[in-house]
C-alpha cells in the first residue's frame, strides 16, 4: 500500500475511533438552536451543520463496516448487493469543481432533499436491523443516533436557507425513496442484502451532503477565503 493509501486508512480509523469515543460518552455536536431561540450567526450555523454532517457520515461509515464484519463473509455476497441507489436519479455535482458551479441556493435545496429523503429508509433500517437474527445492539444504536442527528441537520439547513436565501425557501425537490423493499416474509440472506444496500446508499448520500456543506461554508460563510 502506498503512503497516500496508508494515510487515508489511518484517517478513517481515527475518525471511527473518535466517533466511538463520542458515542460511548454520549458527547454530541452542539444543537443547532438552543431552547428554540435561534440567534446564531450564519457563519456559526455553517460551522455547526458541517460538524454535524461529518459526525453523521462517520456514524454511517462505522455502521457499514460493522455490518459487513457481522454479516458479510465473502466477496461474492458483496457483489450481489451493488445496485443503483434510489437517489442516483438526482442530478448532483460529482466533485468540488462542479459543486462550485451550482448556485448556492440550488445546492442548499439539493442538500435539503437528500437529508429529507433519508427519513423513510432510516426508519426501515431501524426496524429491519431489529428483525434479523442476532441483531447487534451496536448497529441498531447507531441507526437510532443517526435518525436523531438527522433531525438536527435538517433544522440547520432550513435555518441557513431562511437566513441566506429566504426567497429560495420551499424550492427543494421533494424526493421519496422508491422501491424500498418489504422485509416481511423474506429469507435472511435477502433481508441482509437489502439492509446492506440501504446502509451503503444512505452513507453515499451523507458523504455528498457533508462535502456540499463544506463547499458552501467556504463559499458563503468565509467568502471563498478557505
Swiss-Prot record:
Stored PROSITE patterns: SOMATOTROPIN_2
Protein localization: Secreted
Disulfide bonds: 33-38, 85-201, 218-226
Signal peptide positions (record): 1-29
Modified residues (Phosphoserine): 53, 117
Cellular-component GO terms for this entry: extracellular region; secretory granule
UniProt xrefs under InterPro entries: 4_helix_cytokine-like_core (IPR009079), Somatotropin/Prolactin (IPR001400), Somatotropin_CS (IPR018116)
TM spans (from-to): none
Biological processes per GO annotation: cell population proliferation; epithelial cell proliferation; lactation; mammary gland development; maternal behavior; positive regulation of cell population proliferation; positive regulation of epithelial cell proliferation; positive regulation of receptor signaling pathway via JAK-STAT
Primary location: secreted
GO molecular function, one term: prolactin receptor binding
Coiled coil: none
Organism domain of life: Eukaryota
Xref: Pfam families: Hormone_1 (PF00103)
Key words, A-Z: Disulfide bond, Hormone, Lactation, Phosphoprotein, Secreted, Signal
Assembly information from the UniProt record: Interacts with PRLR.
Family: Belongs to the somatotropin/prolactin family.
Protein function: Prolactin acts primarily on the mammary gland by promoting lactation.
Protein's recorded name: Prolactin
Lineage of the species this protein comes from: Eukaryota, Metazoa, Chordata, Craniata, Vertebrata
Amino acid at each position: 500500500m502506498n503512503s497516500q493509501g496508508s494515510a487515508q486508512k489511518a484517517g478513517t480509523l481515527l475518525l471511527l475511533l473518535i466517533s466511538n469515543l463520542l458515542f460511548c460518552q454520549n458527547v454530541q455536536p452542539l444543537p443547532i438552536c438552543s431552547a428554540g431561540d435561534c440567534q446564531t450567526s450564519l457563519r456559526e450555523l455553517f460551522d455547526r451543520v458541517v460538524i454535524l454532517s461529518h459526525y453523521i457520515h462517520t456514524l454511517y461509515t462505522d455502521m457499514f463496516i460493522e455490518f459487513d464484519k457481522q454479516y458479510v463473509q465473502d466477496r461474492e455476497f458483496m457483489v450481489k448487493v451493488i445496485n443503483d441507489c434510489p437517489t442516483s436519479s438526482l442530478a448532483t455535482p460529482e466533485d468540488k469543481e462542479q459543486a462550485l458551479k451550482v448556485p448556492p441556493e440550488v445546492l442548499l435545496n439539493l442538500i435539503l432533499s437528500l437529508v429529507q429523503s433519508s427519513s423513510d429508509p432510516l426508519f426501515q433500517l431501524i426496524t429491519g436491523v431489529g428483525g434479523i437474527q442476532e441483531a447487534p445492539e451496536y448497529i441498531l444504536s447507531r441507526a437510532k443516533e443517526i435518525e436523531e442527528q438527522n433531525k438536527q441537520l435538517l433544522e440547520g439547513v432550513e435555518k441557513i436557507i431562511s437566513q441566506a436565501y429566504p426567497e429560495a425557501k420551499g424550492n427543494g425537490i421533494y424526493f421519496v425513496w422508491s422501491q424500498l423493499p418489504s422485509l416481511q416474509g423474506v429469507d435472511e440472506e435477502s433481508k441482509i442484502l437489502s439492509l446492506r444496500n440501504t446502509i451503503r446508499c444512505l452513507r453515499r448520500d451523507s458523504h455528498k451532503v457533508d462535502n456540499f456543506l463544506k463547499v458552501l461554508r467556504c463559499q458563503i460563510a468565509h467568502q471563498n477565503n478557505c
